[in-house]
Amino acid sequence: MLCSLFLLLLAVGRVQTTRPCFPGCQCEEETFGLFDSFSLIRVDCSSLGPHIVPVPIPLDTAHLDLSSNRLETVNESVLAGPGYTTLAGLDLSYNLLTSIMPSAFSRLRYLESLDLSHNGLAALPAEIFTSSPLSDINLSHNRLREVSISAFTTHSQGRALHVDLSHNLIHRLLPHPARASLPAPTIQSLNLSWNRFRAVPDLRDLPLRYLSLDGNPLATINPDAFMGLAGLTHLSLASLQGILHLPPHGFRELPGLQVLDLSGNPKLKWAGAEVFSGLGLLQELDLSGSSLVPLPEMLLHHLPALQSVSVGQDVQCRRLVREGAYHRQPGSSPKVVLHCGDTQESAARGPDIL
Protein backbone atom coordinates (compact mmCIF):
# COMPACT_ATOMS: atom_id res chain seq x y z
CA MET A 1 0.00 0.00 0.00
CA LEU A 2 1.09 3.56 -0.65
CA CYS A 3 1.20 4.67 2.99
CA SER A 4 3.25 1.66 4.05
CA LEU A 5 5.67 2.20 1.20
CA PHE A 6 5.83 5.89 2.04
CA LEU A 7 7.00 5.16 5.60
CA LEU A 8 9.56 2.67 4.37
CA LEU A 9 11.04 5.14 1.93
CA LEU A 10 11.46 7.80 4.61
CA ALA A 11 14.44 5.85 5.86
CA VAL A 12 16.05 5.98 2.43
CA GLY A 13 15.92 9.75 2.08
CA ARG A 14 13.69 12.20 0.28
CA VAL A 15 13.68 15.41 -1.72
CA GLN A 16 10.70 17.76 -1.63
CA THR A 17 9.76 20.03 -4.54
CA THR A 18 6.76 22.17 -5.51
CA ARG A 19 4.64 21.28 -8.53
CA PRO A 20 2.03 23.22 -10.53
CA CYS A 21 -1.34 22.93 -8.83
CA PHE A 22 -4.99 23.98 -8.99
CA PRO A 23 -5.33 27.71 -8.11
CA GLY A 24 -5.32 28.15 -4.33
CA CYS A 25 -3.98 24.66 -3.62
CA GLN A 26 -0.41 23.63 -2.95
CA CYS A 27 1.12 20.53 -4.50
CA GLU A 28 4.35 19.13 -3.08
CA GLU A 29 6.20 16.25 -4.66
CA GLU A 30 8.42 14.09 -2.48
CA THR A 31 10.92 11.84 -4.22
CA PHE A 32 12.66 8.91 -2.56
CA GLY A 33 15.31 6.32 -3.15
CA LEU A 34 18.34 6.19 -5.38
CA PHE A 35 18.11 8.52 -8.38
CA ASP A 36 14.71 9.76 -7.14
CA SER A 37 13.18 6.50 -8.28
CA PHE A 38 9.86 6.94 -6.46
CA SER A 39 7.66 9.99 -5.86
CA LEU A 40 4.49 10.90 -3.97
CA ILE A 41 2.40 14.05 -4.25
CA ARG A 42 0.67 15.75 -1.34
CA VAL A 43 -2.08 18.22 -2.28
CA ASP A 44 -3.20 20.85 0.24
CA CYS A 45 -6.52 22.50 -0.62
CA SER A 46 -7.47 23.43 2.96
CA SER A 47 -9.15 26.65 4.13
CA LEU A 48 -10.31 27.73 0.66
CA GLY A 49 -14.09 27.43 0.98
CA PRO A 50 -16.78 25.03 -0.29
CA HIS A 51 -16.37 26.15 -3.91
CA ILE A 52 -13.08 24.22 -4.09
CA VAL A 53 -14.80 20.85 -4.66
CA PRO A 54 -14.68 18.95 -6.85
CA VAL A 55 -11.02 19.85 -7.34
CA PRO A 56 -8.78 18.29 -10.02
CA ILE A 57 -5.57 16.83 -8.62
CA PRO A 58 -2.42 15.32 -10.18
CA LEU A 59 -2.61 11.73 -11.36
CA ASP A 60 -0.16 10.39 -8.76
CA THR A 61 -1.58 12.16 -5.69
CA ALA A 62 -1.10 10.18 -2.47
CA HIS A 63 -2.61 12.58 0.08
CA LEU A 64 -5.35 15.21 -0.25
CA ASP A 65 -6.15 17.80 2.43
CA LEU A 66 -9.67 19.27 2.16
CA SER A 67 -9.93 20.36 5.79
CA SER A 68 -11.49 23.64 6.99
CA ASN A 69 -13.47 24.30 3.81
CA ARG A 70 -16.97 24.57 5.32
CA LEU A 71 -18.08 21.55 3.28
CA GLU A 72 -21.62 20.45 4.15
CA THR A 73 -21.81 17.18 2.24
CA VAL A 74 -19.55 14.68 0.51
CA ASN A 75 -20.67 12.36 -2.26
CA GLU A 76 -19.10 10.22 -4.95
CA SER A 77 -18.87 13.07 -7.46
CA VAL A 78 -16.83 15.23 -5.06
CA LEU A 79 -14.16 12.53 -4.81
CA ALA A 80 -14.03 11.46 -8.45
CA GLY A 81 -11.43 11.96 -11.13
CA PRO A 82 -8.16 10.48 -12.39
CA GLY A 83 -6.05 11.67 -9.43
CA TYR A 84 -8.37 10.16 -6.82
CA THR A 85 -7.69 6.57 -7.79
CA THR A 86 -4.26 6.62 -6.10
CA LEU A 87 -5.27 8.43 -2.89
CA ALA A 88 -3.90 6.78 0.25
CA GLY A 89 -4.79 9.61 2.65
CA LEU A 90 -7.79 11.98 2.77
CA ASP A 91 -8.36 14.77 5.31
CA LEU A 92 -11.94 16.10 5.61
CA SER A 93 -11.63 17.39 9.17
CA TYR A 94 -12.95 20.73 10.45
CA ASN A 95 -15.79 21.00 7.96
CA LEU A 96 -19.57 21.25 8.39
CA LEU A 97 -20.43 17.71 7.36
CA THR A 98 -23.68 16.42 8.84
CA SER A 99 -24.10 13.44 6.53
CA ILE A 100 -22.12 11.34 4.07
CA MET A 101 -23.52 9.47 1.10
CA PRO A 102 -23.06 5.67 1.36
CA SER A 103 -21.09 5.62 -1.91
CA ALA A 104 -18.91 8.64 -1.09
CA PHE A 105 -15.66 6.64 -0.86
CA SER A 106 -16.55 3.84 -3.27
CA ARG A 107 -13.94 4.84 -5.88
CA LEU A 108 -11.05 5.27 -3.43
CA ARG A 109 -9.63 1.78 -3.86
CA TYR A 110 -6.29 2.53 -2.19
CA LEU A 111 -7.41 4.77 0.68
CA GLU A 112 -5.72 3.81 3.96
CA SER A 113 -6.18 6.89 6.17
CA LEU A 114 -9.39 8.93 6.51
CA ASP A 115 -9.88 11.92 8.82
CA LEU A 116 -13.49 13.01 9.39
CA SER A 117 -12.93 14.58 12.80
CA HIS A 118 -14.43 17.88 13.95
CA ASN A 119 -17.61 17.76 11.88
CA GLY A 120 -21.29 17.38 12.74
CA LEU A 121 -21.89 13.79 11.65
CA ALA A 122 -24.87 12.24 13.41
CA ALA A 123 -24.93 8.84 11.68
CA LEU A 124 -22.79 6.48 9.60
CA PRO A 125 -24.26 4.70 6.56
CA ALA A 126 -23.94 0.93 6.57
CA GLU A 127 -20.96 -0.48 4.66
CA ILE A 128 -19.64 3.00 3.90
CA PHE A 129 -15.99 1.91 4.13
CA THR A 130 -16.19 -1.48 2.41
CA SER A 131 -14.54 -0.36 -0.85
CA SER A 132 -11.29 0.92 0.71
CA PRO A 133 -8.40 -0.86 2.49
CA LEU A 134 -8.55 1.55 5.43
CA SER A 135 -6.21 1.13 8.38
CA ASP A 136 -6.98 4.41 10.19
CA ILE A 137 -10.38 6.14 10.60
CA ASN A 138 -10.75 9.29 12.70
CA LEU A 139 -14.35 10.21 13.57
CA SER A 140 -13.64 12.09 16.78
CA HIS A 141 -15.47 15.29 17.71
CA ASN A 142 -18.72 14.62 15.86
CA ARG A 143 -22.32 14.14 17.03
CA LEU A 144 -22.66 10.38 16.65
CA ARG A 145 -25.12 8.81 19.12
CA GLU A 146 -25.50 5.20 18.01
CA VAL A 147 -22.94 3.37 15.89
CA SER A 148 -22.96 -0.08 14.33
CA ILE A 149 -19.71 -2.00 14.51
CA SER A 150 -20.50 -3.35 11.04
CA ALA A 151 -20.02 0.14 9.60
CA PHE A 152 -16.26 -0.38 9.95
CA THR A 153 -15.98 -3.44 7.75
CA THR A 154 -13.35 -2.47 5.18
CA HIS A 155 -11.61 -3.96 2.17
CA SER A 156 -8.52 -4.45 4.31
CA GLN A 157 -7.98 -8.20 3.85
CA GLY A 158 -7.28 -8.68 7.56
CA ARG A 159 -5.07 -5.63 8.15
CA ALA A 160 -5.26 -3.95 11.56
CA LEU A 161 -7.76 -1.09 11.78
CA HIS A 162 -7.51 1.87 14.16
CA VAL A 163 -10.78 3.71 14.88
CA ASP A 164 -11.14 6.95 16.87
CA LEU A 165 -14.71 7.67 18.03
CA SER A 166 -13.77 9.89 20.96
CA HIS A 167 -15.67 13.05 21.89
CA ASN A 168 -19.03 12.07 20.43
CA LEU A 169 -22.44 11.48 22.05
CA ILE A 170 -22.38 7.70 21.67
CA HIS A 171 -24.40 5.74 24.21
CA ARG A 172 -24.74 2.50 22.29
CA LEU A 173 -22.69 0.31 19.96
CA LEU A 174 -24.56 -2.23 17.87
CA PRO A 175 -22.58 -5.51 17.68
CA HIS A 176 -21.73 -7.19 14.40
CA PRO A 177 -24.55 -9.62 13.48
CA ALA A 178 -23.63 -13.28 13.75
CA ARG A 179 -25.06 -14.03 10.29
CA ALA A 180 -23.85 -10.91 8.52
CA SER A 181 -22.88 -11.26 4.86
CA LEU A 182 -19.65 -9.32 5.43
CA PRO A 183 -16.91 -10.33 7.90
CA ALA A 184 -16.51 -8.57 11.23
CA PRO A 185 -14.24 -5.51 11.16
CA THR A 186 -10.58 -6.06 12.04
CA ILE A 187 -10.50 -3.28 14.65
CA GLN A 188 -7.40 -3.60 16.84
CA SER A 189 -7.40 -0.09 18.34
CA LEU A 190 -10.65 1.57 19.46
CA ASN A 191 -10.93 4.95 21.17
CA LEU A 192 -14.36 5.44 22.77
CA SER A 193 -13.28 8.09 25.27
CA TRP A 194 -15.54 10.97 26.29
CA ASN A 195 -18.84 9.56 25.12
CA ARG A 196 -21.98 8.61 27.08
CA PHE A 197 -21.56 4.92 27.82
CA ARG A 198 -22.99 3.84 31.18
CA ALA A 199 -21.78 0.28 30.73
CA VAL A 200 -18.93 -1.34 28.84
CA PRO A 201 -20.26 -1.97 25.30
CA ASP A 202 -20.36 -5.45 23.81
CA LEU A 203 -17.16 -5.72 21.78
CA ARG A 204 -16.77 -9.48 21.76
CA ASP A 205 -15.13 -11.14 18.77
CA LEU A 206 -13.28 -7.96 17.75
CA PRO A 207 -9.49 -8.53 17.62
CA LEU A 208 -8.92 -5.59 19.97
CA ARG A 209 -5.46 -4.85 21.34
CA TYR A 210 -6.16 -1.30 22.60
CA LEU A 211 -9.37 0.09 24.12
CA SER A 212 -10.04 3.47 25.74
CA LEU A 213 -13.25 4.29 27.63
CA ASP A 214 -11.86 7.38 29.35
CA GLY A 215 -14.31 10.05 30.46
CA ASN A 216 -17.49 7.96 30.16
CA PRO A 217 -20.16 7.85 32.93
CA LEU A 218 -19.49 4.19 33.76
CA ALA A 219 -20.93 3.18 37.12
CA THR A 220 -19.46 -0.29 37.49
CA ILE A 221 -17.46 -2.97 35.71
CA ASN A 222 -19.31 -6.28 35.57
CA PRO A 223 -17.22 -9.47 35.74
CA ASP A 224 -18.22 -10.38 32.17
CA ALA A 225 -17.89 -6.84 30.77
CA PHE A 226 -14.82 -7.72 28.70
CA MET A 227 -15.92 -11.16 27.56
CA GLY A 228 -14.45 -12.14 24.21
CA LEU A 229 -11.54 -9.67 24.45
CA ALA A 230 -8.81 -12.07 25.53
CA GLY A 231 -6.33 -10.45 23.13
CA LEU A 232 -6.59 -6.98 24.69
CA THR A 233 -3.20 -5.69 25.91
CA HIS A 234 -3.96 -2.02 26.77
CA LEU A 235 -7.09 -0.82 28.61
CA SER A 236 -7.70 2.78 29.68
CA LEU A 237 -10.49 3.66 32.15
CA ALA A 238 -9.21 7.08 33.20
CA SER A 239 -11.26 10.07 34.39
CA LEU A 240 -14.58 8.26 34.44
CA GLN A 241 -17.52 10.50 35.25
CA GLY A 242 -19.27 8.13 37.64
CA ILE A 243 -18.36 6.64 41.01
CA LEU A 244 -16.56 3.61 39.68
CA HIS A 245 -16.91 0.39 41.65
CA LEU A 246 -14.43 -2.36 40.85
CA PRO A 247 -15.72 -5.76 41.98
CA PRO A 248 -13.46 -8.76 42.62
CA HIS A 249 -12.32 -10.51 39.43
CA GLY A 250 -13.60 -7.60 37.33
CA PHE A 251 -10.86 -8.12 34.73
CA ARG A 252 -10.84 -11.90 34.66
CA GLU A 253 -11.67 -12.00 30.94
CA LEU A 254 -8.43 -10.16 30.06
CA PRO A 255 -5.60 -12.64 30.66
CA GLY A 256 -3.31 -10.91 28.13
CA LEU A 257 -3.66 -7.38 29.51
CA GLN A 258 -0.29 -5.62 29.95
CA VAL A 259 -1.27 -1.98 30.64
CA LEU A 260 -4.21 -0.80 32.78
CA ASP A 261 -4.95 2.91 33.32
CA LEU A 262 -7.34 3.77 36.18
CA SER A 263 -5.97 7.27 36.77
CA GLY A 264 -8.07 10.34 37.52
CA ASN A 265 -10.78 8.48 39.46
CA PRO A 266 -10.77 10.12 42.92
CA LYS A 267 -13.97 8.33 44.00
CA LEU A 268 -12.83 4.91 42.92
CA LYS A 269 -14.30 2.23 45.20
CA TRP A 270 -12.06 -0.67 46.08
CA ALA A 271 -12.92 -4.30 46.67
CA GLY A 272 -9.46 -5.59 47.52
CA ALA A 273 -6.55 -6.81 45.47
CA GLU A 274 -8.76 -9.59 44.07
CA VAL A 275 -9.92 -6.95 41.58
CA PHE A 276 -6.76 -7.77 39.63
CA SER A 277 -7.11 -11.52 39.87
CA GLY A 278 -6.29 -13.19 36.58
CA LEU A 279 -4.06 -10.40 35.25
CA GLY A 280 -0.94 -12.53 35.26
CA LEU A 281 0.72 -10.56 32.43
CA LEU A 282 -0.03 -7.01 33.64
CA GLN A 283 3.15 -4.90 33.66
CA GLU A 284 1.94 -1.29 34.10
CA LEU A 285 -0.79 -0.05 36.43
CA ASP A 286 -1.77 3.63 36.72
CA LEU A 287 -3.72 4.55 39.87
CA SER A 288 -2.60 8.19 39.99
CA GLY A 289 -5.22 10.74 40.94
CA SER A 290 -7.21 8.14 42.88
CA SER A 291 -7.71 7.56 46.58
CA LEU A 292 -6.00 4.16 46.50
CA VAL A 293 -3.05 5.03 48.74
CA PRO A 294 -1.41 3.11 50.32
CA LEU A 295 -1.42 0.25 47.86
CA PRO A 296 -3.40 -2.80 48.88
CA GLU A 297 -1.48 -5.63 50.45
CA MET A 298 -0.77 -8.70 48.38
CA LEU A 299 -0.87 -6.65 45.14
CA LEU A 300 2.23 -8.30 43.70
CA HIS A 301 0.87 -11.72 44.52
CA HIS A 302 -2.04 -11.11 42.15
CA LEU A 303 0.15 -9.35 39.57
CA PRO A 304 3.32 -11.44 39.26
CA ALA A 305 4.53 -9.61 36.10
CA LEU A 306 3.95 -6.08 37.45
CA GLN A 307 6.86 -3.72 36.79
CA SER A 308 5.53 -0.24 37.66
CA VAL A 309 2.62 1.42 39.47
CA SER A 310 1.67 5.10 39.56
CA VAL A 311 -0.23 6.23 42.67
CA GLY A 312 -1.34 9.43 44.38
CA GLN A 313 0.19 12.59 42.99
CA ASP A 314 3.46 12.08 41.10
CA VAL A 315 4.41 8.90 42.96
CA GLN A 316 5.96 6.15 40.88
CA CYS A 317 6.57 2.65 42.22
CA ARG A 318 8.84 0.16 40.50
CA ARG A 319 9.36 -3.52 41.06
CA LEU A 320 12.62 -4.54 42.74
CA VAL A 321 13.93 -7.99 43.55
CA ARG A 322 16.05 -8.17 46.69
CA GLU A 323 18.40 -11.08 47.00
CA GLY A 324 19.45 -10.29 50.56
CA ALA A 325 22.90 -10.08 52.15
CA TYR A 326 23.49 -13.81 52.08
CA HIS A 327 23.04 -16.51 49.52
CA ARG A 328 19.51 -17.79 49.33
CA GLN A 329 18.79 -21.28 50.53
CA PRO A 330 17.86 -23.80 47.84
CA GLY A 331 14.16 -23.58 47.10
CA SER A 332 13.70 -20.12 48.62
CA SER A 333 12.40 -17.16 46.62
CA PRO A 334 13.87 -13.65 46.43
CA LYS A 335 11.95 -10.88 48.18
CA VAL A 336 9.96 -8.76 45.72
CA VAL A 337 9.26 -5.16 46.69
CA LEU A 338 7.73 -2.03 45.23
CA HIS A 339 10.10 0.91 45.62
CA CYS A 340 8.10 4.16 45.52
CA GLY A 341 9.44 7.66 44.97
CA ASP A 342 8.11 11.11 44.13
CA THR A 343 8.74 11.75 40.45
CA GLN A 344 9.25 15.45 41.19
CA GLU A 345 11.90 14.89 43.83
CA SER A 346 15.23 13.15 43.75
CA ALA A 347 14.82 11.63 47.19
CA ALA A 348 13.07 8.29 47.04
CA ARG A 349 10.82 6.95 49.72
CA GLY A 350 11.47 3.68 51.45
CA PRO A 351 10.36 0.52 49.71
CA ASP A 352 6.93 -0.89 50.37
CA ILE A 353 7.28 -4.64 50.68
CA LEU A 354 4.20 -6.45 49.48
UniProtKB/Swiss-Prot annotation:
InterPro entries: Dev_Immune_Receptor, Leu-rich_rpt, Leu-rich_rpt_typical-subtyp, LRR_dom_sf
Record keywords: Developmental protein, Glycoprotein, Leucine-rich repeat, Neurogenesis, Repeat, Secreted, Signal
Induction: By endoplasmic reticulum stress and inflammation. Up-regulated in response to high-fat diet and this is reversed by return to a normal diet.
Residue ranges of every copy of the LRRNT domain listed in the record: 18-59
Disruption phenotype: Expansion of the ciliary body and up-regulation of Wnt2b and Fzd4 expression in the developing peripheral eye. Delayed hair cycle with down-regulation of Tgfb1 throughout the cycle and low levels of phosphorylated Smad2/3. Failure of the axons of the anterior and posterior parts of the anterior commissure (AC) to cross the midline, leading to an almost total absence of the AC in adults.
Keyword Glycoprotein found: yes
Role, per record: Contributes to various developmental events and other processes such as wound healing and cholesterol homeostasis through its interactions with multiple signaling pathways. Wnt signaling inhibitor which competes with WNT2B for binding to Wnt receptor FZD4 and represses WNT2B-dependent development of the peripheral eye. Plays a role in regulating the hair cycle by controlling TGFB1 signaling. Required for the development of the anterior commissure in the brain by inhibiting neurite outgrowth. Essential for terminal differentiation of hippocampal neural stem cells.
Assembly information from the UniProt record: Interacts with FZD4 (via FZ domain); competes with WNT2B for binding to FZD4, inhibiting Wnt signaling and repressing peripheral eye development. Interacts with TGFB1; the interaction contributes to regulation of the hair cycle. Interacts with netrin. Interacts with CCN2.
Miscellaneous notes: This factor is named 'Tsukushi' because its expression pattern in chick embryos is similar to the shape of the Japanese horsetail plant, tsukushi.
Name assigned to this protein: Tsukushi
Source taxonomy: Eukaryota, Metazoa, Chordata, Craniata, Vertebrata
